Amino acid sequence: MVKRGKKTKYLFVTGGVVSSLGKGLAAASIGALLENRGLEVTHLKLDPYINVDPGTMSPFQHGEVYVTDDGAETDLDLGHYERFTSAKMTRKNNYTTGRIYSNVIQRERRGEYLGKTVQVIPHITDEIKAVIREAAGGVDILIVEVGGTVGDIESLPFLEAIRQMKYDVGEENAVYAHLTLVPFIAAAGELKTKPTQHSVKELREIGIQPDLLLCRSDREIAREMKDKIALFCNVDPSAVFTALDVKSIYEVPLSLHKEGLDDKLAELFNIWSRAPRLDKWEQIVQKVKAPKHGEVRVGVVGKYVELHESYKSLNEALVHGGIGADVRVKQVFIDSTKLEEGDLSELNQVDAILVPGGFGVRGTEGKILAVRHAREHKIPFFGICLGLQMAVIEFGRSVLGLERANSLEFDEQTPHPVVTLMEAQKAVADKGGTMRLGTYPCALKDGTKARELYGVDLVQERHRHRYEFNNAYRAQYEGAGMVFSGTNPELNLVEMIELNNHPHFVGCQFHPEFKSKPFAPHPLFAGFVHAAREQRDQQADRRAAVTKLPVGKNV
C-alpha cells in the first residue's frame, strides 16, 4: 500500500570502469546511514540481463539467488539491503530486463497500446519508471541500484529511464551517485584518475550528470586529487568521496559517514534529518575485528566453493553467528567432489561442518561422506535444505541399513526414496519460479534443540526447494533415534531434524541465512557457531591433558 503525505526522493546508484565494485554494498550502506538519520528507506535493484529472474541461472555465473518472504528469486544485493536496513524486500524490489520486456509485451498482446508501435522509448522506459515509482511505496528515500557498468549496451534503457526521472520528479527529488575505481598503479607509485574521468564522460554522454562520486580505492584519496576529479568530472569538490577498501563490509557505513556522504545527501535532497546514531555499527565492527574468544574453523562442504558469492548470505550468517558468540568464524570451503576421491583429511581440520543447499547429483556423495564424518566423530553439524536431505540419506544408509537409499532427484530407481518430490511439484513442467518458494510456518517440538534455540513454538522461514523427506519412512527414522523437531503444521512436511546422541546435529529444509542480520544473528547460526566454539575448546582441553601425562604412562 502506498503511503500518503510523503513525496519520495530518489537516489540512483550507477557504476563505472569495472564490474563488482560494490554498488550493492554502497547502496545498502547509504540506506543504513539514512535510516540512522531517522529517514524511511527502501531499495530497488534493476538488473540488465534478459532472464526474468536469476532463479534458473548457474551460481557460477550469477552467485547466490536470494529469496524474499513473498517467494521472489532475486539478486544477492537484496540480501545486503535487508541485512543493513530494516526494509523488507519483495518481488517489487528487483526487476530485470526480461521482466520489464515481458510486462510490456503482455500489455501489447492485450491491446493496451491502442495500435501504437511499441518501442524502447517511450514504452520500455515508461515501464521502468513505473516500477521505480511502485517500489517507492511512499518512503522518504528510494535507493535505486542500476546493475552492470556504464557503457554496457544492456543498461541503456535503464539509464535513459533514470535520466528522465530527474525531470519528472524535480531537481531536489533525484540524486545521481556514481561509483568508480581509482586504481593505484604500483609501477608509477600513484593513484590514477583517468578511468574515473572516462567513466563519468560516458555517463554524461548518455545525459546524466552525476551529483556525487564514490571513488573506490585501496587507500585514502588526497584532497588535491579529489579536486582534480571534481574539475574534470564537473562535480562539486565536496561531492567527491573515497570509498575505501575495508576489512569488514560492516565498516562501510562508518567509512562513508566519516567521509561526510550522508551529510552531503541531506544537503542535496534538501531534507531535514537528525545526526546518525552509529554506536551499534561501531560495536559490531569491534566484535568482527577483535572478538574476545578467538577463532573457530567451520568447514562449508559444497560444490560451488570456487565462487564464494554462491553462498553470500550463508557466509554473512556465519559472521553474524560469530558476532553472537564473540568469536571470529574462519570459513574453510571444502569441495564435496574432491571428498568423493576418499581424502577426508580436510574435515579433521575444522571445528564444525556445514552442508549448504544446492541442486543436482554432482558432489552429493561427498556431502554424504561429510555428514557421516560429522555424525560418527561428534563434530557439530548443520545441514541446510539439501544439507538436511544429505543427512537423511546418510542416516538411512548407515544407521537403518537402507541400501542405496537416496533422493528421487538423484536416482529415480532407488529402492528407498527417503527424499521424494513434493506432491505439489509433480505436475510442474516449467523450471523458473515454480519451486516451493517464500515464507512458510514451522512448528517446533518441545524439548528439542530447535525449540531451545528459537525460544518459541512457531517460526516463519524462507524456502526454496522441490523435494522433501518421505514421511513413509518417518517411523523407522524415529525408532532409530532421529528427531523430527520441526514440521509444517498445514502439510506435515518435515522442516527440521536433529540427533539427541550428538553435541549438535541439526538440519533444516528452509534457508535461515536469508533472515539473519548482524544485529540479530539467526538462532540456528548462533547455536551452531556456539557449538563450534565448544568443540574447539574441548579439543584444546583434551590436547592439553595429553601433554600433561607423566612420562612413560600407558594410556
Curated annotation (Swiss-Prot):
Allosterically activated by GTP, when glutamine is the substrate; GTP has no effect on the reaction when ammonia is the substrate. The allosteric effector GTP functions by stabilizing the protein conformation that binds the tetrahedral intermediate(s) formed during glutamine hydrolysis. Inhibited by the product CTP, via allosteric rather than competitive inhibition. Residues 297-538 form the Glutamine amidotransferase type-1 domain. The active site is at C385 (nucleophile), H511, E513. UTP binds at S19, K192, T193, K194, P195, T196, Q197, K228. Pathway: Pyrimidine metabolism; CTP biosynthesis via de novo pathway; CTP from UDP: step 2/2. One of its GO terms (cellular component) is cytosol. Residues 1-271 are annotated as: Amidoligase domain. GO terms for biological process: 'de novo' CTP biosynthetic process; pyrimidine nucleobase biosynthetic process. Its EC number is 6.3.4.2. InterPro entries: Class_I_gatase-like, CTP_synthase, CTP_synthase_N, GATASE, GATase1_CTP_Synthase, P-loop_NTPase. ATP binds at S20, L21, G22, K23, G24, L25, D77. Pfam families: CTP_synth_N, GATase. SUPFAM superfamilies: Class I glutamine amidotransferase-like, P-loop containing nucleoside triphosphate hydrolases. Mg(2+) binds at D77, E145. Catalyzes the ATP-dependent amination of UTP to CTP with either L-glutamine or ammonia as the source of nitrogen. Regulates intracellular CTP levels through interactions with the four ribonucleotide triphosphates. Homotetramer. PANTHER family: CTP SYNTHASE, CTP SYNTHASE-RELATED. This is CTP synthase. It comes from Anaeromyxobacter sp. (strain Fw109-5).
